From Swiss-Prot:
[2Fe-2S] cluster binds at residues 106, 138, 198, 268. This is Biotin synthase. The lineage of its organism: Bacteria, Bacillati, Bacillota, Clostridia, Eubacteriales. Catalyzes the conversion of dethiobiotin (DTB) to biotin by the insertion of a sulfur atom into dethiobiotin via a radical-based mechanism. Binds 1 [4Fe-4S] cluster. The cluster is coordinated with 3 cysteines and an exchangeable S-adenosyl-L-methionine. Its EC number is 2.8.1.6. NCBIfam families: bioB. Its cofactor is [4Fe-4S] cluster; [2Fe-2S] cluster. It comes from the Bacteria. [4Fe-4S] cluster binds at residues 62, 66, 69. It is an enzyme of class 2 (transferase).
């Protein structure tokens, strides 16, 4: 019996793979790996697809030095800078996305964390939006304290986003102004506040496949509900502007392995999808059951109507 069949049976029986077992799958062919990951997804998660959109609620002037990010004040990019968007702009965007058939809507803000006044402002916005429509609210506001995370929860936010970005051992190569443990503490505080967790990372930063596997196992230990996987889109002016873009085969292999490691979570194809020739269709057949639609924070994405059509054609329920 091949490893891929053996480990598929183990997962479908309710057991989790060890890191050593996952590493054995690295030698498997991509076609078989992707197809089996999709079988695991269908058996354990069904065909329901989770579609979300984001809005850049505060842009630029970030004091952190994440090497991939156009919003960092350390780098000379052409990013448009602004403070917290007006409440009406956020609410109208949420309603518009709900009417398009999107399930979740997240406000994402630049910076290490919001200050008290900014949290107050956004909590009022979340409360208003919750009253108007039933789109599920997510938030991504950096390394917030427990008290602020609880306020978000009380305002109608159901899920908090904070990416690990990469493995603990590789993180220092990407950012030095905050630590991996800072991120983990924020995630734990968000869970304590009663929020679901959306946490994943970026692939193509220069990390190895082993780094990606390590990150996935850390996410499993943290019991996150959603794992967004971004493909690096190198941005001019950042230290990674000349980073080579991953091959499509490497992307498919990574997402498929994530399904073997995280058999029951929402694995979400996120930023960088517009770089792919088929807009991510093959990846969506490799164990994925979620995606971010529309534009990203500082790069263009894919129209939601186009996404929904493609997702339905693949047999998913949206």
């Amino acid at each position: 019996m091949s490893n891929i069949i053996k480990y598929k049976k183990k997962i479908l029986n309710g057991d989790l793979l060890t890191k050593e077992e996952v590493e054995e799958l690295l030698e498997e062919g991509i076609t078989d790996l992707a197809a089996t990951a999709n079988e695991i997804r269908e058996f354990l998660c069904g065909n329901k697809f989770d579609l979300c959109t984001i809005i850049n609620g505060k842009s630029g002037r970030c004091q952190e030095n994440c090497k991939y990010c156009a919003q960092s004040s350390y780098f000379d990019t052409d990013i448009i800078e602004y403070n917290i968007l007006h409440s009406d702009r956020i609410i109208n965007s949420g309603i518009s996305n709900y009417n398009k058939g999107v399930h979740r809507f997240s406000v994402v803000t630049s910076g290490r964390a919001l200050n008290n006044n900014e949290v107050d402002t956004l909590c009022k916005t979340y409360s208003k939006l919750k009253e108007i429509c039933s789109i599920r609210l997510c938030a991504s506001h950096g390394l917030l304290k427990y008290e602020d995370l609880k306020r978000l929860k009380d305002s109608g936010v159901t899920r908090y986003h904070n990416n690990l970005e990469t493995s603990k051992s590789f993180f220092k190569n990407i950012c030095t102004t905050h630590t991996y443990n800072d991120k983990i503490e924020t995630i734990k505080n968000a869970k304590k506040a009663g929020l679901e967790i959306c946490s994943g990372g970026i692939i193509g930063l220069g990390e190895t496949m082993e780094d990606r596997i390590d990150m996935a196992f850390t996410l499993r230990e943290l019991s996150v509900e959603s794992v967004p996987v971004n493909i690096l889109n190198p941005i001019k002016g950042t230290p990674l502007e000349n980073q080579e873009i991953l091959s499509y085969e490497e992307i498919i292999k990574t997402l498929a392995l994530f399904r073997f490691i995280l058999p029951t979570v929402q694995i979400r194809l996120a930023g960088g999808r517009a770089l792919l020739s088929d807009k991510g269709k093959k990846v969506l057949e490799s164990g994925v059951n979620g995606a971010i639609s529309g534009d990203m924070l500082t790069t263009l994405g894919i129209e939601t109507s186009e996404d929904i059509k493609m997702i339905k054609n693949l047999g998913f329920e949206v």
